[in-house]
Design a protein with these regions (language model features):
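Non-heme Fe(II)-dependent double-stranded beta-helix
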Residues: 2-17, 24-122, 128-131, 243, ...
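Feature marks short, surface-exposed loop/turn motifs that line or immediately flank catalytic pockets
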Residues: 114, 148, 163, 234-236
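Double-stranded beta-helix
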Residues: 147-213
Length: 273
């Protein structure tokens, strides 16, 4: 199988307590090099399906080499990436962790942080989907390279899924201080911060709650840090009647006339009971 994982009671306990879990083995390692090749082609503007992704934040020759590169909804452009992010195992696992009846993909990310690639601001994923009812999310984060503290791996604020939902970050890409918005929240609300870096091998996985604060620092290593991410919402989630904050300005265009459904042509249903 391409993807395989088994969630036990300890995983569920850890997720509910901390807002995230990490597992060392998730995706069959034979796929990693091919996925890296596909990612390189995407950023060169070569799309297997002929369809551009919804967001394409870095282009060769146009943008600085030392920023973190991002593509959103690469599943529309590449069939191998679609096979990963639309895998039923992801939907079932996130549903178990969140207590949902099922899950659908709201958006994927391909993130490529090159050597000296800059940081990504601490944020909560759910803050970007006020255009979805209910405003909740859960995320599957799959590294294609070994994740170490020095290569700018993902960091979680432990137990922060129990805090308030804050507005989206104003300075997500390459901020001067990637912890500023989190630090501001901590000071105002008198919270104590404990962070946990995701240190797992290539082909492992982390799952996190949409309320969990997370971000990543500069890649201080001399190797690339590439990740594929699947963001999911409950299977029965709908469009909010009017909200368009966060990523809504991009994704409300997929709202059908006279309907509030998240249509599976644009927001694939991954799994349901």
């Amino acid at each position: 199988m391409m993807i395989e994982v088994s969630i036990n009671k300890e995983h569920l306990k850890d997720f509910n307590r901390d807002g995230f879990i990490t597992i060392n083995k998730f995706i069959d390692l034979q796929y990693l090099e091919n996925l890296k090749e596909r990612i390189a082609l995407l950023f060169q503007g070569e799309f297997e399906t002929g369809i551009e992704p919804d967001e394409w934040n870095w282009r060769s020759g146009r943008d600085p080499n030392n920023v973190t590169r991002q593509i959103c909804n690469a599943w529309k452009s590449d069939n191998l990436i679609k096979k990963v992010v639309c895998n039923p195992v992801i939907g079932e696992t996130l549903s178990k962790l969140m207590g949902w009846q099922g899950a659908r993909l709201i958006q994927d990310n391909v993130l490529w942080k090159p050597p000296q690639g800059k940081s990504l601001s601490y944020h909560q994923d759910a803050s970007y989907v006020d255009w979805v009812v209910p405003q909740t999310m859960a995320t599957c984060w799959i590294p294609l390279d070994n994740m170490l503290k020095e290569n700018g791996t993902l960091e979680f604020a432990v137990k922060s899924h129990q805090w308030d939902l804050c507005p989206p970050s104003d300075n997500f890409h390459a901020p001067k201080d990637y912890k500023k918005e989190l630090d501001d929240y901590l000071k105002i609300n008198n919270k104590i911060l404990k962070t946990s870096p995701v240190v797992i091998p290539a082909g492992g996985v982390s799952f996190h709650h949409g309320m969990t604060w997370h971000g990543s620092g500069v890649n201080q290593s001399n190797t690339d840090r590439r990740v594929i991410v699947a963001h999911c919402v409950p299977n029965d989630a709908k469009f909010h009647p009017s909200n368009s904050g966060g990523t809504g300005k991009i994704y409300r265009k997929y709202k059908l006339n006279n309907s509030d459904e998240l249509n599976s042509s644009f927001f694939p249903l991954l799994w349901e009971k």
